[in-house]
Amino acid sequence: MTKPAILALADGSIFRGEAIGADGQTVGEVVFNTAMTGYQEILTDPSYAQQIVTLTYPHIGNTGTTPEDAESDRVWSAGLVIRDLPLVASNWRNKMSLGDYLKANNVVAIAGIDTRRLTRILREKGAQNGCIMAGDNISEEAAIAAARGFPGLKGMDLAKEVSTKDTYEWRHSVWNLQTDSHPEIAASELPYHVVAYDYGVKVNILRMLVERGCRVTVVPAQTPASEVLAYKPDGVFLSNGPGDPEPCDYAIKAIKQVLETEVPVFGICLGHQLLALAAGAKTVKMGHGHHGANHPVQDLDTGVVMITSQNHGFAVDESTLPGNVRAIHKSLFDGTLQGIELTDKSAFSFQGHPEASPGPNDVAPLFDRFIDAMAKRR
C-alpha cells in the first residue's frame, strides 16, 4: 500500500503524489533534468548534493538499478521527483528496483505528480527551494515553511563536504564488455601521472583518464598546492562538484599556485568555474541552470556543434574574462560560456561533462587534449 507525499515550493506551490522512497522530509534546491536515461548516475553524482532532482521524462525506473552504474559510493541528490514509477523493472543488469534502491539509500522521493507543470514553474521562475514530505505525517504549511527556510546554494561551499577525506590512487578503466568489469590497469602500463582534485568527482571521469594512460592520484578538495606539486605530476585535474564556486577560497588559492608552474591543468564543471576564478574571472548564479544530456554546445574555433551532458547552476561570466583567458565553447541554448583556455598557460576547462554518464560522448576528445598537453611537456 502506497503512502502519500507532497512537494512544496518556496512560492507556495503544492504537488500531491505518492511516496516511492523513504519516509520523512528533505529540503533542497529543486531543479529539472531532461535526460531520458541515467537516473542512477544522476542520483549518485555528487554535483547534485543539496538538490531535489525532477526528471522530466515520464517513465523512470524501467531498467532498475545496478552497482556498476553508480558514479560514487552513495546517493547525493537530496530527493527525487518523477511522474511515473513502473511496476516492474526489466533489464538483464537489474539488481534492485528503483523504489527499493531509494528506500535502501534513505532517499525521500515522490511520484505521480504533474512534472510538466513543475518544470514550467522552474523554467519561468528559476530554480526554487523545495521540500518533499513522505509518509503518514505530512503538512502543507510545514513543508512550505521548510522550503522557505532552506538558505539556497548561493554562497554555499559544498565541495569540501562531498570530497574524499583521504588521498587514494585510481587505476580502474572504462567498462570492458568481454570481462564484464572495470579492469584495473597495472601502474607500469600507465605512463602519465595525474593528480585529481576531488570536489565531488564522478568515477567515470577517473576511468576515462585511466583509459588514456593516466595513473590518477585523487586528493581532498582542501589539499594545498604544495602537496599536489610534491607528487611531480604530469598534469592536474580539477573535478566536477556541487554548490557555489566563489566560497571555495582554498581551491582558488591552490589553483593559482598550480598555474604559476608549467603543469597542464584541465577542469570540468565546478573545476571549470574554479579555474576561471583563479584566473581572475567571476561567476554568476543561473536562473534554472543546465541539467540534461541533450545540450548543444559550439566549439568557437571550429564551429562544430556537439551534444553534451550538463549539470550546473552557476556559470562563468564571460564579460569578466581577463585578457589572458579566451572563450572556446558556448551553449547554443542560452549563449552562456561553456569553455575557456588560458593563452599563457597550458590550462583549459569545460563547463559540461565530457565523461557523460549519462549522455553522449561528443566532448570526450577534451580528455585527449589533456593527454596531448602532458605529452608535449615531456
From Swiss-Prot:
Keyword ATP-binding attached: yes
SMART domains documented for this protein: CPSase_sm_chain
Pfam families documented for this protein: CPSase_sm_chain (PF00988), GATase (PF00117)
Pathway: Amino-acid biosynthesis; L-arginine biosynthesis; carbamoyl phosphate from bicarbonate: step 1/1; Pyrimidine metabolism; UMP biosynthesis via de novo pathway; (S)-dihydroorotate from bicarbonate: step 1/3
Top-rank lineage group of the source organism: Bacteria
InterPro entries: Anth_synth/Amidotransfase, CarbamoylP_synth_ssu, CarbamoylP_synth_ssu_N, CarbP_synth_ssu_N_sf, Class_I_gatase-like, CPSase_GATase1, GATASE
PROSITE patterns registered for this protein in UniProt: GATASE_TYPE_1
Known catalytic reactions: hydrogencarbonate + L-glutamine + 2 ATP + H2O = carbamoyl phosphate + L-glutamate + 2 ADP + phosphate + 2 H(+)
EC category: ligase
Residues noted as binding L-glutamine in the record, renumbered to the chain: 47, 241, 243, 270, 273, 311, 313-314
EC number(s) given by UniProt: 6.3.5.5
The keyword ATP-binding appears for this protein: yes
Catalytic residues in the record: 269 (nucleophile), 353, 355
Subunit structure of this chain's protein: Composed of two chains; the small (or glutamine) chain promotes the hydrolysis of glutamine to ammonia, which is used by the large (or ammonia) chain to synthesize carbamoyl phosphate. Tetramer of heterodimers (alpha,beta)4.
The protein's role, per its UniProt record: Small subunit of the glutamine-dependent carbamoyl phosphate synthetase (CPSase). CPSase catalyzes the formation of carbamoyl phosphate from the ammonia moiety of glutamine, carbonate, and phosphate donated by ATP, constituting the first step of 2 biosynthetic pathways, one leading to arginine and/or urea and the other to pyrimidine nucleotides. The small subunit (glutamine amidotransferase) binds and cleaves glutamine to supply the large subunit with the substrate ammonia.
Database matches in NCBIfam families: CPSaseIIsmall (TIGR01368), PRK12838.1 (NF009475)
Protein name, as recorded: Carbamoyl phosphate synthase small chain
Gene assigned in the entry: carA
